[in-house]
Amino acid sequence: MNLFDFFRERKKQSSASIAKERLQIIVAHERGQRSAPDYLPDLQKELIEVIRKYVNIDNDQVQVVLEDQGNCSILELNVTLPDR
Amino acid sequence: MAKILVVTSGKGGVGKTTTSAAIGTGLALRGHKTVVVDFDVGLRNLDLIMGCERRVVYDFVNVIQGDATLGQALIKDKRLENLYVLAASQTRDKDALSAEGVGRVMDELRESFEYIICDSPAGIEKGAHLAMYFADEAVVVTNPEVSSVRDSDRMLGLLASKSRRAENGEEPIKEHLLLTRYSPDRVNKGEMLGVEDVEEILAIRLLGVIPESQSVLKASNQGIPVILDEQSDAGQAYSDAVERLLGKETPHRFLDVHKKGFLQRLFGGRE
């Protein structure tokens, strides 16, 4: 091992800290979904169907997000319309 | 007032049954009348870990279905006066446990026991759901490893939303983290998540850290709960955890690398 390798070795992240980072991200994501009401996926599906009656869109062009803001929740619906 | 305590984890093989046997035995050792109930219907194993497998006549499902009384099904521990086991059934019928039936048995157990330890099966199916449904407190057994930590977090979500306490709007289940199979040596090398890492991610009270230890397999081989092996590090760590469960503050041990002495290194001492 030369001197250059020695410094590079020290910079390398330990596998435990990679595990921690990955866990923090996935756990935070799953906790967010957990607090969402059970009807959200169905609501999203039906909304897409309704919009499709009028505009031709893909599933991923409709985003339904429920945001919790203390004592009230905001349901945000974001529809990307295709180019005319 | 009787307390129902569930030992759960989500993931399998992390040490739920070992922990249930150890905590149940530890509580009985300290004079509390305790019963350990196996909820793993179809895959009964608590009886083996507790060393009473040859004395199972009636089981949990027999009691629920009215084929036996609770008195007939409870197995009295040979070593300790205050300790009883209720074995799981080996039936393959997935619907053998019903919420109503389990509730009835829990109510009856509450009348004569101080502590009811529910040994949950792995997963989030019916058995696991019913094991935690009636609980007052939960011990979440976790290994310092990504899939176990993630599953534990999932269980914490279920404990907070799908239990009787949650449904009735009562005070939530008191949650405890028990970290098992911990290797301080590997944590030091950066190969394993440390106690602080897991505590930070799950954000619940730490009940104890059980070091990876040969004594756990040795104990299960013999059907003696590892807490009775007072010489072993795992046994001592379980004793500390039981003390904390009873409200005593004791410092956490076995978190640092065990340094071998000169002679031990020379002759290679065994743990």
From Swiss-Prot, chain A:
Segments spanning the bilayer are none
Is Cell division a UniProt keyword of this protein? yes
From the UniProt record, give one GO term of the biological process aspect: cell division
Question: How far does the signal peptide extend, from start to end residue?
Answer: none
User: Keyword Kinase on this protein?
Assistant: no
**What are the alphabetically sorted keywords of the record?**
Cell cycle, Cell division
User: Which SUPFAM superfamilies would you find in this protein's record?
Assistant: Cell division protein MinE topological specificity domain (SSF55229)
Described function:
Prevents the cell division inhibition by proteins MinC and MinD at internal division sites while permitting inhibition at polar sites. This ensures cell division at the proper site by restricting the formation of a division septum at the midpoint of the long axis of the cell.
Give the family from UniProt: Belongs to the MinE family.
Tell me what this protein is called: Cell division topological specificity factor
